[in-house]
Amino acid sequence: MSVLFTILLMAVIGGFIGAMTNYIAIRMLFRPYKAIYLFNKRLPFTPGLIPKRRDELAEHIGKVVVSHLLTEDAIRARLLDENLQKEITDTITKMFHEKMQLETTPNELLHHFGYENAEIRSMTWVEKTLEKEINHFLTTKKTTKMSDLIPTMLESELTTKLPHVTERITSKMTLFVSSEEGKIQIKQMLQKFFEEHGKMGSMARMFINIDSFSEKIQQEGLKLIGQEDTKNLINQLLTTEWKNFEAKELQELIPTEKQAHLAGQLTSELIQTFPHEKLFNQPIQVMLRGYEAAITEKVIPFAVERMLDFVATHSAEIVERMDLAKLVETQIATFSLPEIEKLVVEISGRELKMITYLGGILGGFIGIIQGVLAMWI
């Protein structure tokens, strides 16, 4: 009985020592947090392993993460993953549909981002910028000929339109001369002509019937307008005037002293024409309503694909600039020692307990062997 008791006692003592040894060893990984001094001498194993090697640990973890986990290839592969692209697209599409159910004006949106009086400030800026640019254009281009300012396509289009302008002019002239108003105008001109020539005019009126003479002039005028030579003459005059216009410099048409006034007028007209009140006060959702399907089906998927492709293409540069190793190291360094201890225990608490139990089992087994050997010696 005493032999069995001795062996069991040795087993219990060995198990206790083994378990406590492993328990203390595990605790010494974290504790104490600071060095302990006795008679100005630092006690061995203080501070604990992790507190002592904390900076080295953070640095090495950062390097391991970048070298083996968040590698450029891994990041690129993840960014080009179709599942990720679909997830991001679905998320953005869902957010877009949610926002489309609201009614948010540009004014409200800008106010949300701290931009007060957005409409007034924006239009003031546009007005100043526009007037400045017009003044700059008129100043820098004042010696430039109009032919160089007018776009080639527009110049060609206007040149080809001159015969049509001629046709329109002759058509309007024919319409006016043949009208009752035209007839009255011709009669009034004849009467004025005779009146301006005094007695000779009065004498001529005695032999001429104004009404019939007016009709005759009207008929002859219509014949003259309808002649091809008249059309050619009008077309030639228009062409000549157009060439003269093209040959002029901008400053001939707009003198320097009138530039500022013209710039102000043009700016004012453009600002009044621009529907800024509607733009700033109409809900964005209303403006986008007609394009909602196109945005969700084409724009968002395309934008997500291009964005991920761009990031993947430049992933090496991005990773280098982000310095992920330093980022991980810095983040770990911000953890307090109790937080690090808690994190490790939460992750591997079960395994640490098993190590403690294993120490007890091995200690107990060694105690049994020692008890048996003690009986033989």
UniProtKB/Swiss-Prot annotation:
<protein>
    <recommendedName>
        <fullName>UPF0754 membrane protein Lm4b_02251</fullName>
    </recommendedName>
</protein>
<keyword id="KW-1133">Transmembrane helix</keyword>
<feature type="transmembrane region" description="Helical">
    <location>
        <begin position="1"/>
        <end position="21"/>
    </location>
</feature>
<dbReference type="InterPro" id="IPR016991">
    <property type="entry name" value="UCP032178"/>
</dbReference>
<dbReference type="GO" id="GO:0005886">
    <property type="term" value="C:plasma membrane"/>
</dbReference>
<keyword id="KW-0812">Transmembrane</keyword>
<comment type="similarity">
    <text>Belongs to the UPF0754 family.</text>
</comment>
<dbReference type="InterPro" id="IPR007383">
    <property type="entry name" value="DUF445"/>
</dbReference>
<keyword id="KW-0472">Membrane</keyword>
<feature type="transmembrane region" description="Helical">
    <location>
        <begin position="357"/>
        <end position="377"/>
    </location>
</feature>
<keyword id="KW-1003">Cell membrane</keyword>
<dbReference type="Pfam" id="PF04286">
    <property type="entry name" value="DUF445"/>
</dbReference>
